[in-house]
């Protein structure tokens, strides 16, 4: 099952056997309806909150509305997912949740103040929620990619100069591939040890922890 706002990949997902529901991750009602629909098919074993936005702008060039939009899209939607899906999982006594953070959540990057606040909030929330629900069967983690070759990063990836400059800041000297991030998410949702919770896995080519 997938709740998506952009219907451009609906046919592709449906072809893979995914039940696609159009909705907005910032809408409490949409998430409640989605979770209720999924529960009709059985237990909810795993939830992925895969939401992001591209907002590279210094604070003096960003107004209150733009900042709040970044927080709503990323952090508020994550809380709603945690709250609503978490409640469904608590009634089962088990479940795994993964949230999308970013290297900006733990590393000071130029002009990333808004997204850093949002993703840093997600990481803190994940750690706290992992503690809250550890003895109730829920395992809650996050994945924090660096620059990855996705549609969201197209403003950088489509500019050769910007792409090369970004790559030079990464210890492995290349941007990430979406398949690499997907593999980590799959592991967390299906194969990670039962005692693995409250962790932030950085798929950023070493950027957040390695100096070369």
What residues fall within each predicted segment?
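Short C-terminal tail/terminal secondary-structure segment
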Residues: 107, 186, 197-212
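Short, small/polar-rich loop/turn modules that mediate ligand/substrate recognition or access, typified
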Residues: 134, 139, 196-198
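Substrate-binding pocket helix/loop in short-chain dehydrogenase/reductase
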Residues: 58-59, 66-71, 166
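Alpha-helical segment proximal to the catalytic Tyr-Lys
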Residues: 87, 131-132, 194
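Active-site helix of classical SDR
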Residues: 82, 118, 126
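Residue(s) in the substrate-gating loop at a strand-loop-helix junction
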Residues: 102
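Active-site loop immediately N-terminal to the catalytic Tyr-X3-Lys motif
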Residues: 60, 107-113, 135-136, 173, ...
């Amino acid at each position: 099952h997938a709740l998506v706002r952009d219907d451009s990949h609906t046919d592709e997902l449906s072809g893979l056997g995914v039940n696609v529901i159009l909705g907005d991750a910032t809408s409490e009602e949409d998430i409640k309806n989605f979770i209720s629909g999924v529960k009709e098919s059985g237990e909810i074993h795993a939830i992925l909150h895969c939401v992001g936005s591209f907002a590279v702008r210094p604070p003096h060039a960003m107004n209150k509305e733009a900042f709040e939009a970044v927080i709503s899209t990323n952090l508020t939607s994550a809380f709603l997912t945690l709250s609503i899906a978490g409640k469904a999982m608590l009634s089962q006594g088990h479940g795994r949740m993964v949230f999308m953070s970013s290297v900006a959540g733990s590393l000071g990057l130029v002009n990333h103040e808004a997204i850093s606040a949002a993703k840093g909030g997600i990481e803190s929330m994940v750690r706290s929620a992992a503690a809250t629900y550890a003895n109730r069967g829920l395992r809650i983690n996050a994945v924090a990619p660096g620059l990855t070759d996705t549609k969201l990063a197209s403003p950088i990836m489509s500019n050769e100069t910007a792409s090369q400059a970004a790559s030079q800041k990464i210890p492995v000297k290349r941007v990430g591939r979406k398949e690499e991030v997907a593999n980590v998410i799959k592991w967390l949702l299906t194969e990670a040890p039962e005692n693995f919770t409250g962790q932030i896995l950085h798929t950023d080519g070493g950027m957040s922890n390695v100096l070369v």
